[in-house]
């Protein structure tokens, strides 16, 4: 769950419920609290919704304001991510030291039968790397407009997997489940190429929660998934680049 959006929702609920009669409600707000149990008046509830959507620049978004706080936070996260990654995020492939076009040669050295680009964006590597499949839930230039969690059910293995700034958001557990699904799809002897931007907040994406990747985190994941952390580099902008290799 996106902790930034969760905090925003809680703070706005506390403002909307800032009356003595709601003291018991506000003191017990948590992600499993349901809107139906709050007893908030229709006028205050409508104002709360308007404030959230205006703050997040999602005025036209349709949200089901019912059920748990967590379910509403997840809806807001999906709507905001769709807008941000589909309309705002414009990567400049040429500027990345280790995972720009230089990555093409690294992948080709493997002579891969199949390559998966996770969070491919505009699918820029499609024409440069043979046998590449690009997936991205937010961009219709991808081969399949799905998340890695959905795509992991396919009966297919890839000799190389690219994840450039895509497995980089929300909590440690969110990272873990996505990495686990990538690992399931990676063929024996294959490699996963990562770029992550720990703590680098996009100026136009204040509600995107960036995960704090580090060497220690990458090392621990390699150990957990029985992979080799083959390479770990960092550029002058604190972006981190690393390669996981699966034993043959």
Regions found by a protein language model. Name each.
Residues 1-27:
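Thiotemplate assembly-line natural product biosynthesis machinery
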Residues 19-20, 25-27, 46-52, 72:
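4′-phosphopantetheine-dependent carrier domains
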Residues 23-38:
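Short, surface-exposed beta-strand segments enriched in small/polar/acidic residues
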Residues 42-67:
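Phosphopantetheinylated carrier protein domains
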Residues 65-67, 77-152, 191-248:
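Class I (Rossmann-like) S-adenosyl-L-methionine-dependent methyltransferase catalytic domain
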Residues 149-161:
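A short acidic, Gly/Pro-enriched loop at the edge of an enzyme's catalytic core
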Residues 160-173:
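A short SAM/SAH-binding and catalytic strip from SAM-dependent methyltransferases
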Residues 176-188:
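A short glycine-rich, Lys/Arg-flanked "PGG" loop and its adjoining helix->strand segment in the class I
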């Amino acid at each position: 769950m996106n902790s930034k959006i969760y905090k925003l929702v809680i703070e706005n609920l506390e403002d909307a419920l800032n009356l003595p009669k709601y003291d018991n409600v506000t003191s017990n707000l948590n992600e499993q609290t349901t809107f139906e149990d709050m007893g908030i008046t229709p006028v205050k509830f409508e104002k709360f919704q308007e404030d959230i959507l205006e703050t997040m620049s999602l005025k036209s978004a349709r949200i089901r304001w019912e059920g748990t706080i967590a379910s509403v936070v997840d809806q807001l996260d999906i709507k905001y991510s769709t807008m941000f990654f589909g309309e705002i995020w414009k990567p400049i492939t040429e500027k990345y030291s280790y995972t720009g076009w230089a990555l093409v040669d690294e992948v080709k050295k493997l002579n891969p039968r199949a390559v998966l680009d996770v969070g491919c964006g505009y699918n820029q590597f499609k024409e440069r790397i043979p046998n590449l499949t690009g997936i991205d839930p937010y961009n219709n230039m991808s081969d399949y407009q799905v998340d890695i969690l959905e795509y992991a059910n396919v009966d297919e293995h890839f000799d190389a997997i690219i994840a450039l700034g895509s497995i980089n958001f929300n909590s440690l557990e969110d990272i873990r489940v996505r990495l686990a699904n990538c690992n399931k799809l990676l063929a024996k002897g294959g490699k996963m190429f990562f770029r992550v931007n720990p703590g680098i907040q996009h100026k136009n994406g204040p509600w995107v929660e960036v995960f704090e990747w580090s060497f220690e985190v990458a090392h621990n994941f390699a150990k957990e998934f029985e992979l080799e952390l083959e390479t770990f580099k960092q550029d002058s902008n604190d972006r981190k680049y690393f390669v996981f290799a699966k034993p043959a």
